[in-house]
C-alpha cells in the first residue's frame, strides 16, 4: 500500500525523494563518453593542445606559390624579371665561365 502525499507536500519528503534520485544515478566518472550507435562521436570542448597550435597558425598568412607559365605574354601583362634582364644575366654568367676556363688553362 502506497501513501500518496496531498498537494501541500512537506519539504522533508521532497528532499528524501531527491536524495533517492541522486543515489540511484551513476556518477559522472562512470558515465564517460562513448561513441554513438551510428559511429559518429563528437567533442563539446576543443582539445587545449590543438587550440594552442591554432592560435599560432592563425596569425600567419597563407603561402601563395605562383608558377611561371611558358606561354606568350598577353599585352599589358608585366613579367618579373624582365626578359632583357634575364638575357643580360645569362651573358654575364657565360663570360664569367669563359674567364674561369681561361684562368684554369693558364
From Swiss-Prot:
Residues 69-106 are annotated as: Disordered. Residues 86-96 have a biased composition (Acidic residues). Residues 18-105 form the LBH domain. Keywords: Cytoplasm, Nucleus, Transcription, Transcription regulation. GO terms for cellular component: cytoplasm; nucleus. It comes from the Eukaryota. Residues 97-106 have a biased composition (Basic and acidic residues). It is found in: Nucleus; Cytoplasm. GO terms for biological process: positive regulation of DNA-templated transcription. InterPro entries: LBH, LBH_dom, LBH_dom_prot. The keyword Nucleus applies. Belongs to the LBH family. PANTHER family: PROTEIN LBH, PROTEIN LBH-RELATED. Transcriptional activator. This is Protein LBH. The gene is LBH.
Amino acid at each position: 500500500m502506497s501513501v500518496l502525499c496531498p498537494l501541500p507536500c512537506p519539504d522533508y519528503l521532497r528532499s528524501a525523494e531527491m536524495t533517492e534520485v541522486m543515489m540511484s544515478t551513476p556518477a559522472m566518472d562512470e558515465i564517460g563518453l562513448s561513441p554513438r550507435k551510428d559511429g559518429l562521436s563528437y567533442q563539446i570542448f576543443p582539445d587545449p593542445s590543438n587550440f594552442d597550435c591554432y592560435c599560432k597558425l592563425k596569425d600567419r598568412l597563407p603561402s601563395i606559390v605562383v608558377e611561371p607559365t611558358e606561354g606568350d605574354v598577353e599585352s599589358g601583362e608585366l613579367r618579373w624579371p624582365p626578359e632583357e634582364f634575364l638575357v643580360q644575366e645569362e651573358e654575364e654568367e657565360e663570360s664569367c665561365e669563359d674567364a674561369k676556363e681561361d684562368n684554369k688553362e693558364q
